[in-house]
From Swiss-Prot:
It comes from Salmonella typhimurium (strain LT2 / SGSC1412 / ATCC 700720). Heterodimer of an alpha and a beta chain. Belongs to the bacterial histone-like protein family. CDD domains: IHF_B. The gene is ihfB. InterPro entries: Hist_DNA-bd, Histone-like_DNA-bd_CS, IHF-like_DNA-bd_dom_sf, IHF_beta. This is Integration host factor subunit beta. Disruption phenotype: Decreases expression of genes encoding virulence proteins. Drastically decreases survival in host macrophages. Decreases virulence in mouse. The keyword Lipoprotein does not apply. GO terms for cellular component: chromosome; cytosol. It comes from the Bacteria. SUPFAM superfamilies: IHF-like DNA-binding proteins (SSF47729). Transmembrane segments: none annotated. One of its GO terms (molecular function) is structural constituent of chromatin.
Length: 94
């Protein structure tokens, strides 16, 4: 599901809320989550999961075109850990 599909579905389900308000709310929520992670903070949504940053250590990679070795710097990457309720709900397909 894309962001626009999510907005469309929420606007359809919540017909008493204008579609523009739904779009603004979704965009604001995602922006707030991104800025929270950018500040190094963790986000926990009970029953859904948590978002945090994991450190990826420096390593040697390869240029896919030339095969040359490339030194990659260490960096922080976003990480999502699903909560138990979400894992259980998703497991109905497994």
């Amino acid at each position: 599901m894309t962001k626009s599909e999510l907005i469309e579905r929420l606007a359809t389900q919540q017909s008493h809320i204008p579609a523009k308000a739904v779009e603004d709310a979704v965009k604001e929520m995602l922006e707030h989550m991104a800025s929270t992670l950018a500040q190094g903070e963790r986000i926990e949504i009970r029953g859904f999961g948590s978002f945090s940053l994991h450190y990826r250590a420096p390593r040697t990679g390869r240029n896919p075109k030339t095969g040359d070795k490339v030194e990659l710097e260490g960096k922080y990457v976003p990480h999502f850990k699903p909560g138990k309720e979400l894992r259980d709900r998703a497991n109905i397909y497994g």
